[in-house]
A protein has these predicted regions:
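Alpha-helical structural elements
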Residues: 6-9, 30, 42, 345, ...
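Conserved acidic, small-residue-rich alpha-beta core segments centered on
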Residues: 134, 299-479, 493
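Flexible, low-complexity junctional segments that flank or bridge functional domains
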Residues: 20-322, 329, 333-338, 423-436, ...
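Bacterial Sec-dependent N-terminal signal peptides
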Residues: 1-22
Length: 497
């Protein structure tokens, strides 16, 4: 699985007329009850980061919010709040298709891309109104801290992680603002110029969705973060950058669909040649592994790559389990097939696969069969020098599983920023999607609860992303110069050895 939620929210549309159509209290309560029961029966990660008491508490809050008819968008925000609270980056919640076929009309979007730099909201676009690099303190009298907190629910991350939400905010700020606060034709912005303390006020005009998208494509930081938001063409690369240092870059693990796929086999051949070269050139004592743009992908690319970095046997998981063998609430399930008979066959095939991989019931959990989690061996040409692992908030799913193994089971010096994917585990692999009966909101989550095969470490905190040994973030000066701060830091660290 991989985290690819940016495009969902960059392009989520909604019809202004539909906002005025309200769901009755009965319909709202029925949908929320169905939603709650689905999570309890099917979602093995429901209590991974939250206790039952905490989970019951947020549902009590949710039910208290629907004592009168509500517009679909308002109910959607309640559901988002719950799915974000659960703490899984594979949780996706989408509006009905008729909300996704047309965009809001008019010049109602905040015009300029922004980016979080050193926890400050910075203008990320050259323009004549609010200069590039300016810090934003408030918009329409809403303080930045309040703005950002209200946007967190739109972009889920593992556990209690906050750093990963910066990816969603930078990619979808204008969409989040419209969704949260409604259409605005004017924006009163309180800001300061780069490296200045004086606060200024400027009223700027909203733009159309088309201009918003065009401005994002032309953002200042594009040379640095293009791979975090666009289609990845160059998925991996290897090069020798100094006589004693090589760089392995893996921008995604979406490299073929399975172990037999030609694209995966080509990747395997590439890794073989790279590490055979390193094995034959022992003067290369340093390997930089850059996975900062890696939002995940497919098995077995992540664990195959790790085999070239370790000297000891390893597994993908310490434990994996699901809550069910027969899909709960099949009437609300979203099927790929459209004909009832084929839907029945689709469900039965899915359930047979679940029963094969998770056959044994122990303490209310269906445990993964060991044959699906074999003990794996290091490659004969695995690297034996010093590893430097570059990480960022973008790393998720299979990307964070790989990074956690490299962090916990190699000599890697981990450099960069906390990932959105967890160190100790996550819910992943197998997604299911349901549609609520009245609102037609779709909710997707992954059903396999994974505990990753990593040791406990003092600096790795349960419920957080992978925390670097050396936190290195872009400064405002680096941002303005589009400087690759983490990479340059790593090269200097190697030079000082």
């Amino acid at each position: 699985m991989f985290k690819s939620k940016i495009m969902l929210f960059v392009f989520i549309p909604f019809l202004m007329a539909a906002q005025n159509q309200k769901l009755s209290v009965y319909e709202l309560k029925q949908d929320l009850t169905v939603f709650k029961e689905i999570r309890e029966k099917a979602n093995s990660g429901l209590y991974k980061y939250r206790t039952k008491q905490q989970t019951d508490s947020i549902y009590s809050w949710a039910f208290s919010q629907i004592n009168e008819p509500k517009a679909l968008l308002d109910f959607y925000k309640i559901i988002l709040k719950i799915t974000d609270f659960e703490g899984s980056l594979h949780n996706d919640t989408t509006l009905p298709e008729n909300f996704q076929n047309k965009f809001s009309s008019g010049n109602v979007f905040f015009p300029y891309p922004v980016k979080l730099i050193e926890d400050k909201l910075i203008v990320n676009f050259r323009n004549t109104e609010i200069p590039l690099g300016s810090e934003i303190f408030s918009i329409n009298k809403i303080k930045t801290k309040e703005l950002l907190a209200s946007f967190y629910k739109y972009y889920t991350t593992d556990g209690y992680n906050i750093s990963g939400k910066s990816i969603g905010i930078a990619g979808s700020f204008a969409r989040y603002f419209e969704m949260e606060y409604g259409s605005q034709k004017k924006f009163l912005v309180e800001y300061s110029l780069p490296d200045k303390s004086q606060k200024l006020l400027k009223t700027i005009t909203g733009v159309s969705n088309e201009i918003r998208k065009e401005n994002f494509k032309n953002r200042h930081s594009l040379p640095i973060d293009s791979l975090q938001y666009g289609k990845i063409k160059n998925k991996y690369s290897f090069k020798v950058i100094t006589p004693n240092t090589s760089l392995l870059t893996i921008n995604t693990f979406a490299i073929g669909n399975n172990a037999e796929d030609k694209e995966h086999l080509a990747y395997k051949k590439h890794l073989d040649s790279c590490f055979q070269y390193l094995s034959n050139n022992l003067q290369i004592k340093n390997l930089i592994v850059d996975v900062r743009n890696n939002g995940g992908g497919t098995d077995p690319n992540d664990i195959l790559t790790f085999s070239y970095l370790t000297q000891k046997p390893y597994r993908e998981n310490a434990e994996a389990y699901v809550n069910f063998q027969e899909i709960p609430f099949p009437n609300y399930l979203v099927y790929e097939e459209t004909e009832p008979q084929k839907q029945h066959e689709e469900r039965k095939d899915f359930e047979e696969e679940i029963k094969e991989e998770f056959p044994k019931l122990e303490n209310g959990k269906y445990i993964q069969d060991e044959k699906f989690n074999a003990l794996l061996q290091p490659d004969k040409n695995s690297f034996k020098g010093q590893i430097y692992l570059l990480i960022s908030p973008r790393i998720a799913s299979a990307g964070s599983l790989f990074a956690s193994l490299a962090t916990g089971r190699t000599n890697a010096i981990v450099i960069g920023e906390e990932t959105m994917g967890g160190y100790y585990g996550h819910n992943g692999h197998t997604p299911v999607e349901y549609e609520l009966p009245n609102s037609k909101i779709k909710t997707q989550f992954s059903i396999v609860n994974l505990e990753q095969d990593v040791p406990k470490k003092a600096n790795q905190i349960f419920g957080r992303g992978i925390i670097p040994d050396r936190e290195v973030r872009q400064t405002l000066e680096d941002f303005l110069k589009n400087k690759d701060t983490q990479f340059e830091y790593t090269l200097k660290l190697i030079e000082q050895k």
